[in-house]
């Protein structure tokens, strides 16, 4: 064997011994310096990395590629139903079926569990406390997005999550011209479902990830409860550069970069709010919307009997670029 061939084999062996750097193989991490993430979880800038199967930053940090949902190794402690029973679900989302709620009868426990089954890492990663915090954080963020509560509401404002299933009074079709995710004629991409999925550039990749054409059928997010929950879980589980996935944050798989730390973005529930709506809610001191998200989170953690963790707000965090 020639010296060059021997070097190549040794280099390959060293490479294989190092953990993957990005994408689904690395908890949804993105590559530094706008490099592409290959289908195999490695960073680079050639067609081997940026071509077919590229997971993120396929055209640099300006876009390209389809965000990939990470599927971390489950802890082996059972599915999400082992963390949240039907009775607990009903207690947490106490007034979702109130007669005044637009979504009455829509958000069912069975749909929640079925959707979670399509994302094996959701609510199954890490210790029991980590799993509980993930479910609490997910339901808190989505409860804020769909809340029907008010300050003097029966049982408190934080008992009224999941009251709405679609945006009220939408005045835009939320269509951004895109060759990759073209809008269908006559369709609107306003907020729907638990996370209030908006814009064609989110409906497109969400639909591809769950196997449904949501560009042509966006109303499914407000008419099929399992599809609805799946879109929210897709958003939760999927890193979109430069943001990590909410799942990676709450399960402790995200390590903030120096840039993140300089911006005040450190692990905790607060950075998830930054991921969801940081451009509007974070970085300018106290904000009632951030406080509302925290209120839901604390209530759900209390019901699940788990600690809140640190860094709950994003008042002093700069939004992700």
Swiss-Prot record:
User: What is the disulfide pattern of this chain?
Assistant: 22-37, 31-43, 34-61, 36-50, 54-58, 101-163, 175-183, 301-314
One GO MF annotation is: chitin binding
Q: InterPro entries, per this entry?
A: Chitin-bd_1, Chitin-binding_1_CS, Endochitinase-like_sf, Glyco_hydro_19, Glyco_hydro_19_cat, Lysozyme-like_dom_sf
Ranges for domain Chitin-binding type-1 = 20-60
Its activity depends on temperature as follows: Enzyme activity is retained almost fully under 40 degrees Celsius and completely destroyed at 70 degrees Celsius. At 60 degrees Celsius the activity was over 80% compared to the untreated enzyme.
PROSITE patterns (alphabetical) = CHIT_BIND_I_1, CHIT_BIND_I_2, CHITINASE_19_1, CHITINASE_19_2
Can you supply a Gene Ontology BP term from the record?
Answer: killing of cells of another organism
Region Hinge region (Gly/Pro/Thr-rich): start-end pairs: 62-79
Q: Where is this region: Catalytic?
A: 80-321
Q: Which GO terms describe its cellular component?
A: extracellular region
Q: What span is annotated as the signal peptide, if there is one? A: 1-19
Q: Which family does it belong to?
A: Belongs to the glycosyl hydrolase 19 family. Chitinase class I subfamily.
This chain's protein is named Basic endochitinase A
From what organism does this protein derive? Secale cereale (Rye)
